[in-house]
Design a protein with these regions (language model features):
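HhH-family (HhH-GPD) DNA N-glycosylase catalytic core used in base-excision repair
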Residues: 1-230
Length: 230
């Protein structure tokens, strides 16, 4: 881990936030917010929902969020059935998310009982994103560190920054483990002193050493991955 730490020590949390805010997914949501010029909490719920079906895409994630944001510019939502009906029509017609349609619609359905609670607690959830992680994991019957659950909270934060005062990601939210992180772990782990907690412990230790919360660290790794993997 020390070699990876040495390459990342030049970055701090401000750098991470700057990287996040040039992310095409962040920019797509910011453009949507500016175009709509509204704080409708249904949009926050819609974005959480979309995050939870943002996997096994038929295109790039950045392209999908731009497509999603563009199609929302002329739409309004006032209740859960309207949100479900939107996804029921949108997913099969999407250029970038046409795979596993039935499975994804079932995931949307799971959120119905969470809808009203979420609308009441949006600001609370933004200030307590670790609580949102736990509640989403219960609703979706997934682990709190599951990639889609963590990603949903990340995207929720992206939109919420337009509405509320900026909040850092809590330190106890896990970084979403994907192929990039697995490749870096294989490259930089010390096989002579394996960690009991494996890849998760590796990144937790790196986060603490850099003093950058795990989910903010994700942005630094994303932007610098090609250099780090050399």
């Amino acid at each position: 881990m020390q070699k990876l730490y040495n390459k990342l020590i030049k970055y701090n949390i401000k750098d991470a936030i700057n990287f996040e805010e040039i992310d095409r997914q962040f920019l797509a949501l910011k453009d949507l917010y500016l175009n709509k010029k509204m704080n409708n909490k249904n949009y926050l719920f819609l974005i959480i929902t979309n995050s939870l079906i943002c996997y096994q895409l038929s295109g790039k994630g950045e392209d999908y969020w731009e497509e999603f944001s563009e199609i929302l510019e002329n739409k309004e939502f006032n209740n859960f059935p309207e949100i479900y009906n939107f996804f029921e029509k949108f997913i099969p017609e999407s250029r970038n998310n046409r795979r596993f349609i039935e499975t994804k619609l079932k995931r949307v359905s799971k959120l119905e009982n969470f809808y009203l609670e979420f609308l009441w607690k949006t600001e609370f959830y933004y200030k307590n994103m670790d609580k949102l992680i736990l509640d989403l994991s219960k609703v979706m019957n997934q682990k709190a560190d599951a990639k889609t659950i963590v990603f949903a909270v990340k995207i929720f934060s992206y939109w919420s920054r337009n509405i509320y005062d900026f909040q850092y990601f809590p330190e106890n939210i896990m970084i979403p483990i994907d192929s990039r992180l697995e490749n870096l772990y294989k490259k930089y782990e010390n096989p002579l002193t394996p960690l009991p907690g494996g890849i998760k412990e590796f990144y937790i230790n790196l986060s603490k050493k850099l003093n950058i919360p795990l989910l903010h660290l994700d942005a630094i790794v994303w932007v610098n991955y090609d250099e780090l993997i050399k």
